[in-house]
């Protein structure tokens, strides 16, 4: 297939049509019974099949959401009014849909098949991408088979990835998730400017057998460069300055700055300005993943995402999993007013997945201004949070079941675990996941609680005291994502599903999901305060709180 960049124009949607569709949806939401999930199951014995979609072994079950067939019809009308399909095509054709930075958004190109062509500014992106992938594969295989050695001639057995944000969250999450596929060096991750992070990591490593990846597009990210300099001095103090070129590689587009650091040009892995940080795991930022699991498994990871890309691009509206997922997210956030969503992977190796989605979702859709420069008149992206099951059950599930706020839950489940000899134990995990989903939906009435308490021998007076405390309202919405096994392919597909879901939610909200000016603002202020904190500048024209905090910190340091 051949793709071609189509220019910068991005159509402006018909706001009157969208507002009419949204108001129709809001009116529908006020009707009795729409949110009554229990009743929906009673009235439709085939609700599961009517309200679920499949893509090979991926099951997307949204039957436990407070919606009806009419809700789906109105949501589809909303998608048409928002021009979801047109905006989708704009992304796939290379239009500059990141309007504030005038950039194309082409992380999808990073996982395109090798025989496809995607022309942008006279270059075939697929060929450029494959060249970088081949570079990554050659280098990673040399490290993995021991032919690439450190400065003393010893084999590299530890990798330290130094990055932050998308240069850390994605690589760390994926590397941890794919632990059963590790047959390469041990991988460590350093991101925080807290000196404890780099110090604790280096304390257990041998300089002679350690390789550092410095992951920074601009090679100016403050936290990353600070940690990189500490690592550089650590190598120099043990092995000498000449060892830097053997013990450091970079993922960056700033070739001059990387060269100044002392990294050989043959060990610089390129990526492009159309790769956003939170979408960069598919690029050379994934080098640490490839070092851990090998090139073949990394390509399977890309293939899984590619399958979801293809489904997102060609599946009709009513059968399109990312679009349906996004419409439900919009329904929950904007129409129902649910302020957060809980991501609960019943997979310990996906324990970092909620944190990964926090950046992917909240950095993308935590916006208050529309594409046409107007303040939004509804709530934008939800707070995203979560933890792995069953751990979360013993921490915050109490609030999910009986708290005053309704919080939609997104369960992620795999039918099988990698530890086949522990299969009976894995059944406990699966049973708990299914039980929590059912409990949130079904609840337990006061009458049922009374019957249970009386049957257990508790007297009537005590029963009345306990009944309300032990009852559950139910009708709490949840979505279930089920796949066979956590593999490079299924993980890639899962991440791409969430990427496209978040993109479509941004379309519905009419915002730019691909900039992050709030993050940039924080960096700007930190750069202003740093020389003041170090006593190099005076603290003029600051608010009293900032001045007071600076004075307190400096005074305590001098004691």
Curated annotation (Swiss-Prot):
The keyword Cytoplasm applies. It catalyses: alpha-D-glucose 6-phosphate = beta-D-fructose 6-phosphate. InterPro entries: G6P_Isomerase, G6P_Isomerase_C, Phosphoglucose_isomerase_CS, SIS_dom_sf, SIS_PGI_1, SIS_PGI_2. Its EC number is 5.3.1.9. The keyword Acetylation does not apply. Belongs to the GPI family. PANTHER family: GLUCOSE-6-PHOSPHATE ISOMERASE. Catalyzes the reversible isomerization of glucose-6-phosphate to fructose-6-phosphate. This is Glucose-6-phosphate isomerase. It comes from Bartonella quintana (strain Toulouse). The lineage of its organism: Bacteria, Pseudomonadati, Pseudomonadota, Alphaproteobacteria, Hyphomicrobiales. The gene is pgi.
